[in-house]
Amino acid sequence: MTLRSDEEIAAARIGPPEIHNSTIYLAPYDPEWSRLFEREERRIRAALSDRALLIEHAGSTSVPGLSAKPIIDIVLAVADTTDELAYVPAMEAAGYVLRIREPDWHQHRLFKGPDTAVNLHVFTIGCTEIERMLFFRDHLRSDEADRTLYENTKQELARRTWKYVQHMPTPNQG
């Protein structure tokens, strides 16, 4: 993930970007995060049924022991993200709000959750970004040294002031 310019952020957003201009709060790991994911997974399955081809808890809240922005990141795979009529109306009826459309980045869509701090990342099944996100999650779950390094880097980056709340860069992205 690279840092985005103001123009790129505005182009991907549905509605105006929310200006943050602050540091990022990282909460200590909370086992409630996995329960919140399970509740959202049930809501998504109820809305999409067999159109939800994959639903996974991703991001820092999915890694036991890791501090995180208290936002549940969920990966949803559908048959084709560009066929929005196949899933967007059902997700909106379930209370989710489509906030980001990124045709130039894996045809990514992002919904915000209805009553929980959720980032629902939607990709087409088979997208390499799904594999990357889940590999990273699984690696952090199994490698304590890398999890500690990642946590320390996140804590350092969280102390910076960020205009937008976006994914913080990895250490080699500055």
PLM regions: where:
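Conserved, surface-exposed functional patches that form binding/active-site neighborhoods
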Residues: 100-154
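A residue-level signal for conserved active-site and pocket-lining positions in enzyme catalytic cores
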Residues: 73, 150, 168
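Short histidine-centered catalytic/ligand-binding loop motif
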Residues: 25-33, 76-77, 135-140
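Active-site nucleotide-donor binding segment shared across nucleotidyl transfer reactions
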Residues: 43-85
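Short amphipathic alpha-helical segments
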Residues: 22-24, 70-74, 116-118, 136
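Charged phosphate-binding loop/patch that engages nucleotide di/tri-phosphates or the phosphate backbone
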Residues: 159-174
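Helical scaffold of the NTase/Pol beta-like nucleotidyltransferase catalytic core
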Residues: 1-56
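Metal-dependent nucleotidyltransferase catalytic core
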Residues: 29-44, 78-114
